[in-house]
Amino acid sequence: MANLPIQHASLSWNAQGTPVSQQFDDVYFSNQDGLAETRYVFLQGNQFPERFGTHPRTACVIAETGFGTGLNFLTLWQAFAHFRQQQPQATLRHLHFISFEKFPLRQHDLAAAHAQWPELAEFADELRQQWPLALPGCHRLILAQGSITLDLWFGDVNVILPELDDTQNHQVDAWFLDGFAPSKNPDMWTDNLFQAMARLCRKEGTFATFTAAGFVRRGLQQAGFHVSKVKGFGQKREMLSGLLPDTLPITSPTPWYSRPAASTTDDIAIIGGGIASVLTALALQRRGANVTLYCAESQPATGASGNRQGALYPLLNNRHDAVSRFFSLAFDFAHRSYSALAQQGLEFEHQWCGVSQLAWDEKSARKIEQILQGEWPEELVVSVDAQQLEKQSGLNPGVNGITYPDGGWLCPAELTAAALKLAQQNGLSVQMSTAVSALEKTDSGWALTLSAGQQVNHAVVVLANGHHITDWPQTRHLPGYAVRGQVSHIPTNPVLGQLKHVLCYDGYLTPVSPQHQTHCIGASYLRGQAHGDYREEEQQENRQRLLNCLPNADWAKTVDISDAQARQGVRCALRDHLPLIGAVPNYEQTLKEYENRLHPQHRADTVSSAPYWQDLFIIGALGSRGLCSAPLAAEILASQMYAEPLPLDRDTLAALNPNRFWIRKLLKGKPVTHD
């Protein structure tokens, strides 16, 4: 996917108080009455809100070209909220709005535009509160207590649309074909756009647009739409609306990375007790699923999710590869998600105090230089010198680095426990101290053998049990490995108490936890080890690593580990640093169907979809960045299970597919071996 830096919109304001794009020299909405124009062109043009009451599915998907000020979205949101109040028993319960924007507005420009529509204020305020960073790709916003999903794709719509995953095909119920006038923005109004609209459109899906330009009408007709000219808004003579009478036949370009949905969502079991499992439960519940959670321990977050303080910051590089794309978006989503949970009243220690990554040696300095070459927005990451670092952090590390202003720390153990309590209030059934010793496919789903010997049945199973995800016959070929880590808890003192920023070097040091009056310093990283015992040598190594990395920081010498206070956990990691999200692939069937058949020289004209275990899913291998990746990973998995549009491009989703290691070899004609 193209990852050019996203530029914000440059605005001016005309005599009527309407925002004007300096990039396109065109108004964002009608000088006459923007709100009335939106209701007439896009809502009435697509038979909204009347259509809500007869919609046959629980979710309605609307796509839009050109988010702009968000006026179309906010107006539709208002209409949907009124509909839900008037018809709470209607089939339609969820609105999924997908919009594309090449030049997103800044928050203060949004606020100025939104001030013109007081009746939309409650919706506009919530939108601005969650307004994402200017990063390329999809930003998923969960609004209206989960009843509205907004997927904001930042970038060129004609670049993004061909890179959407196959799961987006035939999903869109209505198109808002907006954007600046074709004469002002000809690069957007192309045959490629119209054909992509048809590909994504559901049978009898509709569209409406303010323009009646002949080439637009002809392009939509050639793409398969039935097009009608109707009276335009206000003084405008004509506009276009229409529908797609039937869906188009589509061949997947990458069937080996298919993402099957769950056959049912009435009965889902999750195996695990950490942050990934609990956030997955919440994501599924928000969609109406019935979920049971099985945790082998007597309390949640006893594994890698159980630390007192964990740093939240992204994993970036200058290549804008799948790692960088995923973690940049995941970081922003995680920050919004955790803030939203806190606003809901969940109690967990956290501070959005910023995180600084230090250039403590030549290798780390080169890495930081490479990150800065990626031209990331300063709201995400900014270069800082030693003097700035001292001012930000309260202590002088004696080195330069970079800062993630929206980063910080939180208590994973408290977050997991609070989120689990919320899920239970929402109807989650929890079985603690209940290990699952066997997993067997049945005609109706899956049979789980529990630790006490009894057997229970569930239609769908999600594996989210950390480094134990490869314990099952169905997952034993997956390449995840265990990594032991020990975090030291050190008492604060007058010097360390001045630290107000998370510092990352060849380890990390957090500000003081007000609750415990300790700092966390860590962590050891022992690949292939899964023991949970305290080790004095690792305690010493945690302190020594700080001293070695920051030899000129006298304050580091005040770190006291003599109390031998620490916590041990075991992570599950992969060599490519990305998690496993999706259906569990069937190893034997993958080799049987794909071996010697995926290399371009031997590939048949048609290739079957990837073999997988039906109704068995996985979210795992989150490694040491689980706080960053877990919220978006859970959202992706829940979306896949519900056959919803997914919030990532095709290539990034492929890089998260649990079968990716085997498929990469098979595509190159190499043998697949299991270590």
From Swiss-Prot:
Keywords: Cytoplasm, FAD, Flavoprotein, Methyltransferase, Multifunctional enzyme, Oxidoreductase, S-adenosyl-L-methionine, Transferase, tRNA processing
Top-rank taxon, per record: Bacteria
Pfam families (alphabetical): DAO, Methyltransf_30
Catalytic reaction list: 5-aminomethyl-2-thiouridine(34) in tRNA + S-adenosyl-L-methionine = 5-methylaminomethyl-2-thiouridine(34) in tRNA + S-adenosyl-L-homocysteine + H(+)
Chief localization: cytoplasm
Region (FAD-dependent cmnm(5)s(2)U34 oxidoreductase): 271-675
Disulfide bonds, paired cysteine numbers: none
Cofactors that this protein relies on: FAD
Any single GO BP term: methylation
Region of interest called tRNA (mnm(5)s(2)U34)-methyltransferase, as start-end residue ranges on this chain: 1-245
A single Gene Ontology CC term: cytoplasm
An annotated Gene Ontology molecular function: tRNA (5-methylaminomethyl-2-thiouridylate)(34)-methyltransferase activity
Role of this protein: Catalyzes the last two steps in the biosynthesis of 5-methylaminomethyl-2-thiouridine (mnm(5)s(2)U) at the wobble position (U34) in tRNA. Catalyzes the FAD-dependent demodification of cmnm(5)s(2)U34 to nm(5)s(2)U34, followed by the transfer of a methyl group from S-adenosyl-L-methionine to nm(5)s(2)U34, to form mnm(5)s(2)U34.
Family: In the N-terminal section; belongs to the methyltransferase superfamily. tRNA (mnm(5)s(2)U34)-methyltransferase family. In the C-terminal section; belongs to the DAO family.
Protein name: tRNA 5-methylaminomethyl-2-thiouridine biosynthesis bifunctional protein MnmC
Taxonomic path: Bacteria, Pseudomonadati, Pseudomonadota, Gammaproteobacteria, Enterobacterales
Gene this chain is encoded by: mnmC
